[in-house]
Amino acid sequence: MTTAAFLTIDTEFAWRHHAAGLDVEEIYARSLEPAGVGLGYQLAELARHDLKACFFVDPMPALLYGIDPIRRMVSTILDAGQEVQLHLHPAWTDAVAGDGGRGHGRFDLSDHDRATQRALIVRATDLLVAAGAPHPIAFRAGSYAANDHTLDALAELGFAFDSSHNGAVFGSSHIMLPKRQIAPIVPLRLAGRGLVEIPVTVVEDTPGRLRTLQLCALSSGESRRALEHAVAAGHVAVTIVSHGFELANRQGNRANAVHVRRFEALCATLDAMRDALPTCHFGDRPPLALGQDDRPLARDPIRRGLRQAEQLWSNWVEERAG
C-alpha cells in the first residue's frame, strides 16, 4: 500500500499588498511571482522532479481587480500540467481598490451562516471557472476557517473533497473533528453525501501543541521525518501546505533562502520517495481508506531546537526587505 501525497499550494493575492495601496500589477508580482521564486519557479521545480501539486486558487480579488489576474494565475498553472482547485478568502467581497484595506468583508468564512457560505462558494466557483479552470471538486477555506456549515454547503454543491481541517490552527479551523485527525475521513454528518475531508497533516511540536506540515513551519529535516513516519506507519495520505508567495519575504521583494532550500529539499524528498509516497491531484481521485487511526509524528526536542535556530535566521535575516 502506498501513501498518497497531496502537495497543496494556496495561491492568492496577499491582503497585505492590497492594504499597502499597491496597484494590481504590483500586487500580482509580489503575491504570485515575488523575487523570482513564485509560481514560475515553483512550477519549474515540480516539473524537474516530475511531481504533482494542487494549487488552491482564490478568485475573489476579481471582484475589484477584474478576472484577468485570476485568468493569468489559472493559465500559468494549467499550462504547466498542474491542478487548480478552489480557495476562498471572503474579505474581498467588500474590498475597495486603493483604500488601504479599510473596506472588507468578514475575513473568516466560518463567521458566515450556512446560506451565506453557500452563496460565497457558488460565487467563487463561478469566478474560477470564468478564469478558465475546470469546475473544482476540492476546496480549502482561507486561513482554514471552515466549520460544519462549510462542509454541508460543499456536499450540497457536489464537491468531492475539503482540505480545511488543520488541528494546528484550531482557533480558526472549526470543523468538528479532533485536532490530531490527519487521516481522510467522512464526518458522521456527511455520511452518504459524497464529501471526504482530507485534513492538513500536523506533527507534534510540544506536549499538547501541533505544527502544520508547511514550508514556513518546519525545517527540511522535520518535513522529511514526517513523510518517512507516514510511510512507515502506513498512513493513508499526507497533506503538505505552502503558498505562492511563501518562498519570498513578506514584502515580496527578496527571496527567503531558508524557505527556498526547504522547497527544493521537499521536492527532492518527494521525488526520492515516489514509489511509496506518490504525489496526487485531487482530480486523480486516488483510492483512500477512510477512518484509519493515523497518528501525527511525535515530538523531538532536538529537531525542534534545530528548527528554531533556523527560524531565527529566517525571521531576522531572510525576511529583511530587499
Residue ranges and their predicted role:
Residues 56-145, 242, 250:
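Metal-dependent polysaccharide deacetylase catalytic core of the NodB/CE4 family, i.e.
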Residues 215-322:
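C-terminal domain-boundary segment and adjacent tail
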